[in-house]
Regions:
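Cytosolic, long alpha-helical scaffolding segments
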Residues: 1-187
Length: 187
């Protein structure tokens, strides 16, 4: 549990929101002042959507920071959320690199990796629920309440990590649309 990093992420959300608003304004100004067509219009439209995905990733990261600070102890050692976290961070980084390089093949690869992340999230959620069902040995109401809070927090963590992966796929899909005018990954 890295509380310093959690605080850094939470405190960085305001800056991300400010950047989002600045970039959104830039996109609107370009649309209004330049009246782009074809590839330029797709570039601005894709960028407009991508900055929304990045802002939402920032919001999810803030949630994850909050969950980290709220967690009192690791009650589910069989669930490796760090592995899922590493996978989705790599997906976001690769999606942004694909955008910058206009790399169509990387876009498809990112979408393919999302299936593995979804499977990891499903497996992790199943481990949590199975563990909860098998416990049944909490003797006090306080222990039951603490376990329920731990379960809820961990399931939210898993869900938010999975959503970060989905936003990485959205970025890849918008990039594919921008480069190839191909909406294959959008739907």
């Amino acid at each position: 549990k890295d509380e310093d990093l959690a605080w850094e992420v939470i405190e960085g959300d305001h800056e991300i929101n400010e950047l989002y608003l600045d970039l959104e304004k830039d996109c609107i100004d370009l649309l209004a002042l330049q009246q782009p067509v074809a590839g330029d219009l797709r570039f601005i439209a894709a960028s407009f959507k991508i900055i929304t995905d990045l802002e939402r990733i920032g919001d999810l990261a803030t949630n994850l920071g909050d969950y980290t600070l709220d967690a009192e102890h690791d009650v589910f050692p069989d669930v490796d959320v760090q592995e899922i976290g590493v996978a989705v961070v790599e997906m976001v980084e690769d999606a942004m690199e694909a955008y910058a390089a206009e790399d169509v093949e990387a876009c498809y690869a990112i979408a393919d990796r999302d299936d593995a992340v979804d499977a990891m999230c499903e497996d992790a959620s199943e481990v949590v629920v199975r563990d909860l069902l098998e416990r049944g040995d909490e003797t006090t109401e306080a222990e039951v309440q603490q376990t329920m809070q731990d379960v809820y927090r961990l399931l939210l963590t898993i869900r938010d990590l999975e959503r970060v992966g989905d936003h990485a796929v959205n970025i890849a899909a918008r990039t594919l649309y921008m480069v190839e005018n191909d909406d294959d990954l959008l739907y």
